[in-house]
Amino acid sequence: MIKLVLIRHGQSLWNLENRFTGWTDVDLSKNGLSEAREAGTILKKNGYTFDVAYTSVLKRAIRTLWIVLHEMDLTWVPIHNSWKLNERHYGALQGLNKDETAKKYGDEQVHIWRRSIDVRPPALTEDDPRYEANNPRYKTLKKDEFPLTECLEDTEKRVVDYWHSEIVPSLKSGEKVIISSHGNTIRSLVKYLDNLSSDGVVSLNIPTSIPLVYELDEKLRPIRHYYLSMDGEVPEGEIPKHISF
C-alpha cells in the first residue's frame, strides 16, 4: 500500500481578510503559522516521514511546507516547486473582498464563479498591475500560456498533468510523498483521484493545514482517505479542529 499526504497551506492573510487570492503571493497569517506547526507535529506524532515534497511557487504553500518539515526534523527533504500546483487563478477577482463582490454581482453569480467547474471569473488584462507573466518565477511559462483567469477545469488539467509527469514516478519508485498546495488545487486532484462528478466536487471543501492521507494501491488507485489529528486517523466524514499551538 502507498500513502500520499496532501496538505492545504495554513490560513493566509487574505483568507483572514476574506479576499480572493488566486496567484497573488500572499503570506501566512499568525494563525496560519500556528496551523502549519500543528500539522507538522501531527504528522511526526503519527509516525510519518517523507522522501520528497512538492509545492507551488506561492509563499503560503511553500512556507507551510517548510514549517511542516522543520517540525518533523526533515528539512533535508528535496522540495520541487511548480506553478502547476498554484491555486486556481481568479482573474480580475484577485484581491477583492468576497462579501463586497457578492453585493456587487449577486450571491448567485459569485457562487458560480467560485464553485462551478467550467465558468471562469472575469479575466485580467495584460496592463493590469496584478498581471505577473514577467515575474521570474514564471520564466518557464510562455506569455501565451500564462493564465488571465481559470475555471476549476483549467486548474484540474494542469494539476493532473503534473501528477502524471512528476508525482506518479516518485510514488511508483517507492518514495514517500507530501504535497503542500492550495484549496482548489487539492480539490482538483481529489476530483481526479476519486473520479468525482462535477456535482460531487462543488460541495468539497479542503480545510487549511489538516493532513489528508490517501492510501493507494499499486496502480495508484485510491483505497481510502482520511484526515489526521493528534489522536490519529479521524473517522470518515469528520474534519478535526485546530488546536492552539
From Swiss-Prot:
GO BP, sorted A to Z: gluconeogenesis; glycolytic process
**What EC number(s) does its UniProt record assign?**
5.4.2.11
What pathway annotation does it carry?
Carbohydrate degradation; glycolysis; pyruvate from D-glyceraldehyde 3-phosphate: step 3/5
Pfam families given in the database record: His_Phos_1
**Site, as annotated: Transition state stabilizer:** H182
Q: Mind listing the GO molecular function terms for this protein?
A: phosphoglycerate mutase activity
Q: Kind of enzyme, top EC level?
A: isomerase
- Catalysed reactions, as listed in the record: (2R)-2-phosphoglycerate = (2R)-3-phosphoglycerate
Q: Which UniProt keywords apply?
A: Gluconeogenesis, Glycolysis, Isomerase
Task: Please name the Gene3D superfamilies in this protein's record.
Answer: Phosphoglycerate mutase-like
Q: Where do the catalytic residues lie? A: H9, E87
Question: What functional role does this protein have?
Answer: Catalyzes the interconversion of 2-phosphoglycerate and 3-phosphoglycerate.
Family classification: Belongs to the phosphoglycerate mutase family. BPG-dependent PGAM subfamily.
Record-linked HAMAP family: PGAM_GpmA
What name does the UniProt record give this protein? 2,3-bisphosphoglycerate-dependent phosphoglycerate mutase
**Provenance organism:** Bacillus mycoides (strain KBAB4) (Bacillus weihenstephanensis)
